[in-house]
Each structure stands twice: as structure tokens, then as C-alpha cells.
Amino acid sequence: MAIKMRLQRFGVHKRPFYRVVASESKNARDGKFLEILGTYDTILDIVELDHNKVQKWLSNGAQPTKTVKKVFKKSKFVAKTNTKVEK
């Protein structure tokens, strides 16, 4: 199954708070997840990510959603890539 990094909604009415989680793509938005990768508060615009966990899931083939990519940009997260230089 495909693993997605996506937002899981918490909070109260008109005060959303999100967790960034890794979950299987067929699970519900607020359903079962594999691991919590961080949090995102939209009101205060605060992003907290565990960069090691995010990098681990990216290297294992997890695909971030469009919204999670925007959250990564806000937190200034840069994914490490394995670039090989050929001579």
C-alpha cells in the first residue's frame, strides 16, 4: 500500500489544529496512522516537525500531499536527497 504524509484535523469548531502523520492512503483522514511527524497550528501559524522522522519516511517512499508540502515550506524543511555525481 502507498504511504502518504497528510494532515489529521484536531481542535474545536473554527479553531483547527493539525497533526502531520504518516498513514496508509486508504485510511480515513482522521483514522488510523503509522506515526506522528509533527503539528501545525493554522491560527498561530506554528509548525513543529521532527525532521528525522520526516526524512525517514521520505526515504522509505512516503508521498507528502500538496498541503503537507506547503507546511514543509513554511517550516523551511529541506529534504536530503542522495545525489550521485558522475565523472
Swiss-Prot record:
Superkingdom as given in the UniProt entry? Bacteria
Q: Which GO terms describe its cellular component?
A: cytoplasm; small ribosomal subunit
- Mention any Pfam family matching this sequence: Ribosomal_S16
Record's keyword annotation contains Ribonucleoprotein: yes
| Alphabetized GO MF terms | structural constituent of ribosome
Q: Which UniProt keywords apply?
A: Ribonucleoprotein, Ribosomal protein
Tell me the InterPro entries matching this sequence: Ribosomal_bS16 (IPR000307), Ribosomal_bS16_dom_sf (IPR023803)
Q: What GO biological process terms does the UniProt entry carry, in alphabetical order?
A: translation
Entry annotated with the keyword Ribonucleoprotein: yes
The record's similarity note reads: Belongs to the bacterial ribosomal protein bS16 family.
**Which PANTHER family does this entry report, sorted A to Z?**
30S RIBOSOMAL PROTEIN S16, SMALL RIBOSOMAL SUBUNIT PROTEIN BS16M
Protein name as it appears in the record: Small ribosomal subunit protein bS16
Name of the gene encoding the protein in the UniProt record: rpsP
